[in-house]
From Swiss-Prot:
Keywords: Cell cycle, Cell division, Cyclin. It comes from Saccharomyces cerevisiae (strain ATCC 204508 / S288c). Residues 41-52 have a biased composition (Low complexity). SMART domains: CYCLIN (SM00385), Cyclin_C (SM01332). Present with 521 molecules/cell in log phase SD medium. The keyword Cell cycle applies. Required for efficient progression through S phase and possibly for the normal progression through meiosis. Interacts with CDC28. This is S-phase entry cyclin-5. The keyword Transcription does not apply. It holds the Pfam family Cyclin_N. GO terms for molecular function: cyclin-dependent protein serine/threonine kinase regulator activity. Residues 110-124 have a biased composition (Acidic residues).
Length: 435
């Protein structure tokens, strides 16, 4: 009995000790929680003091006059800016319409006031039937052109205020990135290559480019890189395919978002080039070209002229085919991209004949860089040579022709070939005839 009593007393003592420990632990947790709340209050109050002590604008402390998007007007409120940031985090790729909404920092009243001012000055702001000088080298005064950049001045995605400077730079840059000479016509050159060999290469490039589903800009850049390299380097026959695939490999890195894998380039050569061969050739090409890759793509100029053509989809499709065809022909590789683009658009408009009275007006002349097809005999000669080549199929571009026979590209080859053939038979009586 005595042992049982001692055991019960021991259990009671242990229970009391345990309860005391639990009580102390609860008190400790309570103090920790109170301290956290106190710290939180102090932190929030200090932040509020800092915010209250320094008045800030919605986005930055920079004066509104330094914001090029604000145009000395009120900038976006803080809540609206926060909403924009959240939307940008959720959707990093924003459409042009959304961009216009994001950067539109004017109030409704200010917009209405500006529209009223524009309505009063429409006649003064319009450049129609006025004489203006183009900001480009060697371009004479052009009468009666419409400033389409001014029409798009409220579209921030079009950066209309910088368009003249951008294209003035591109016109200079295109001359710096041409092949040093036409190595296909100068038989005395030590870099001379038979035109038929280049035709095989570029036609194969068109086929591979189509299989890889790359951007059109990638094809033009790859041809430019290949021509610039061949104009200053002698390449043996068994290395020409390696050169072509490496040119496409470099161009895709420069232009594409989703790149084909290196193994796919090696596979497409059917054993003519390994992965290591392509990597070594890439370094050799880049060194030879001094890593000077960027160039004014001809599609930039075609889109520019297409703006003056009211973005006609038929003319643009035909223009793209003629542009690709011209770049695959050996006799045009020394021409600036802006000239070839103007040739493509002029022939396309001549084919469709949609506005015969204004085949090439002042606006088209301005947006083509000052080219006047009706009075420029050198330009006319180039267009005739191109039409002849398409009609006679001197340049055997089977892959390119097959590509533009597809409905995906509007099947424009059939219409183009038919028209070019009729022009050649009529001795080009209609090509530059405005009657």
């Amino acid at each position: 009995m005595g042992e049982n009593h001692d055991h019960e007393q021991s259990i009671k003592r242990n229970s009391m000790i345990y309860n005391e420990n639990e009580r102390q632990l609860c008190n400790s947790n309570l103090k920790i929680l109170q301290n956290k709340r106190a710290l939180s209050k102090n932190d929030s109050s200090s932040k509020q003091q800092v915010q209250d002590s320094k008045p800030r604008r919605a986005l930055t402390d920079v004066p509104v006059n330094n914001n090029p998007l604000s145009q000395n007007k009120r900038i976006v409120a803080g809540s609206k800016a926060a909403k924009v940031r959240r939307e940008e985090n959720i959707r990093p790729i924003v459409s042009a319409v959304q961009k216009r909404q994001i950067y539109n920092d004017r109030t409704a009243a200010e917009q209405e006031e500006e529209e009223e001012e524009e309505g009063e000055d429409d006649d003064a702001a319009s450049i129609v039937n006025k004489k203006r000088r183009i900001d480009a080298e060697g371009v004479s005064e052009i009468v009666g052109w419409q400033d389409l950049d001014y029409v798009e001045k409220d579209d921030t995605a079009m950066v209309a205020e910088y368009s003249a400077e951008i294209f003035a730079f591109l016109y200079r840059r295109e001359l710096e990135t041409l092949p040093s000479h036409n190595y296909l016509l100068d038989k005395t050159s030590k870099y001379y290559l038979r035109p038929s060999m280049r035709t095989i290469l570029v036609d194969w490039l068109v086929e591979v480019h189509e299989k890889f589903q790359c951007y059109p800009e990638t094809l033009f850049l790859s041809i430019n890189l290949m021509d610039r390299f061949l104009a200053k380097n002698k390449v043996t026959m068994n290395k020409l395919q390696l050169l072509a695939v490496t040119s496409l490999f470099i161009a895709a890195k420069f232009e594409e978002v989703n790149l084909p894998k290196l193994a796919e380039y090696a596979y497409i050569t059917d054993g003519a080039a390994s992965k290591n061969d392509i990597k070594n050739a890439e370094m050799f090409m880049l060194t030879s070209l001094e890593f000077n890759i960027g160039w004014p793509n001809p599609l930039n100029f075609l889109r520019r002229i297409s703006k003056a053509d009211d973005y006609d989809p038929v003319n643009r499709n035909i223009g793209k085919f003629i542009l690709e065809y011209a770049y695959c022909c050996h006799q045009f590789i020394h021409l600036p991209p802006s000239t070839v683009s103007a040739m493509a658009m002029y022939i396309a408009r001549r084919m469709t004949n949609r506005n015969k009275n204004e085949l090439w007006n002042g606006t088209l002349q301005h947006y083509s860089g000052g080219i006047d097809p009706i009075h420029d005999e050198a330009f006319q000669s180039l267009c005739i040579d191109l039409v002849k080549d398409i009609a006679s199929s001197k340049t055997h571009l089977d892959s390119l022709i097959l590509k533009y026979k597809k409905p995906r590209y509007g099947s424009v080859y059939f219409q183009t070939f038919k028209w070019c053939t009729s022009e050649m038979h009529s001795n080009f009586q209609n090509l530059f005839n405005l009657k």
